Amino acid sequence: MPKRTFTKEDIRKFAEEENVRYLRLQFTDILGTIKNVEVPVSQLEKVLDNEMMFDGSSIEGFVRIEESDMYLHPDLDTWVIFPWTAGQGKVARLICDVYKTDGTPFEGDPRANLKRVLKEMEDLGFTDFNLGPEPEFFLFKLDEKGEPTLELNDDGGYFDLAPTDLGENCRRDIVLELEDMGFDIEASHHEVAPGQHEIDFKYADAVTACDNIQTFKLVVKTIARKHNLHATFMPKPLFGVNGSGMHFNVSLFKGKENAFFDPNTEMGLTETAYQFTAGVLKNARGFTAVCNPLVNSYKRLVPGYEAPCYIAWSGKNRSPLIRVPSSRGLSTRIEVRSVDPAANPYMALAAILEAGLDGIKNKLKVPEPVNQNIYEMNREEREAVGIQDLPSTLYTALKAMRENEVIKKALGNHIYNQFINSKSIEWDYYRTQVSEWERDQYMKQY
């Protein structure tokens, strides 16, 4: 949704005119999970005065119990009424930044951390970092108890229409709800895998775009349930089909000028664009754990399913990590194709931006573009042209993250350490599990 500017008086007026009954104060933890404190509208003045307190020790990756008091400072520009609550007492949403009791931003708040990295970008002379995401998701049927099953709601394919695309009605209702909330929807279609869908919305500045991603996920899950469906942003819920990605289309601006566009060069790209790309490539292994944060994420990053496994770039080829779409002028952008929808968008974007700024500050040279299908190249051919692999497991991604100072800087000490600790526990828990596949393979043979 486009950036808006609201005052306290605007919020009071909206709440009264729309007969809002409840306020949902939302924020995001380091795992990308939406958290909220819901209060009756009678608490509006307390909310507007930044006096809403919550227990930070109850939130994954925040603080210890002895330093748990946190305050929610609402971003008034994020005010929106959830359309589906109109019949049962309207609920309005405000996205909040998390503050400590001394009045300073909490260093463990991913949204506040992204703002910190954006300030570093501004110090280099850039004014905006824009993001256009492409989130994908699956729709599964619910059982009679309302629990998700593994039964897909259709067997459609890429760009299919009804009757093959049985998710069309659900997807249309999602789009209508998003538009009612101010989203500018650009495309909505069935994706490659059965039961898989994509809805694209217009790019926005970094913080607004990440807010939009979190709002989008909430709306998709809410409306899907009304259709007796479960929407999941799990990267690879099924074996043998494409997983769900969330490509990040990013661009830097200086005022009204796209800092990536130069009409006088062969590819229409500036030196800044090449340096930014070089920085992303250099730090790609280090930010993979952030952009692909689940054990399951690495089931998607395998050859043969249009997801990148290799660190390279191209102007047209979709097999490398980075693609530069053909649009130029103000639409010039770099597409980072590895990100999946389980990622915390604030953290993923902070990591990608810091990686790109590393390239700009150090004037890194971008390697030659790779225009052949990397999936068809063997290891010797890839090594001959300097193509590295992305990490293939959460374990190797965390190892690469520990070795990368740029990504540590991007996240700050608190988020960096808490994230690595949480994900290391997740990996240890996963590696000790015994799967159905293992029993099928080995029980009888051994």
Curated annotation (Swiss-Prot):
Entry's EC annotation: 6.3.1.2
Protein function: Glutamine synthetase (GS) is an unusual multitasking protein that functions as an enzyme, a transcription coregulator, and a chaperone in ammonium assimilation and in the regulation of genes involved in nitrogen metabolism. It catalyzes the ATP-dependent biosynthesis of glutamine from glutamate and ammonia. Feedback-inhibited GlnA also interacts with and regulates the activity of the transcriptional regulator TnrA. During nitrogen limitation, TnrA is in its DNA-binding active state and turns on the transcription of genes required for nitrogen assimilation.
Residues annotated for Mg(2+) 1 binding in this entry: 134, 247, 335
Binding site for ATP: 186, 251, 318, 323
Record-given protein name: Glutamine synthetase
Residues the entry annotates as binding L-glutamate: 242-243, 300, 306, 318, 337
Site for Important for inhibition by glutamine, residues: 64
UniProt subunit comment: Oligomer of 12 subunits arranged in the form of two hexagons. In its feedback-inhibited form, interacts with TnrA in order to block its DNA-binding activity.
Gene3D superfamilies from the UniProt entry: Glutamine synthetase, N-terminal domain (3.10.20.70), Glutamine synthetase/guanido kinase, catalytic domain (3.30.590.10)
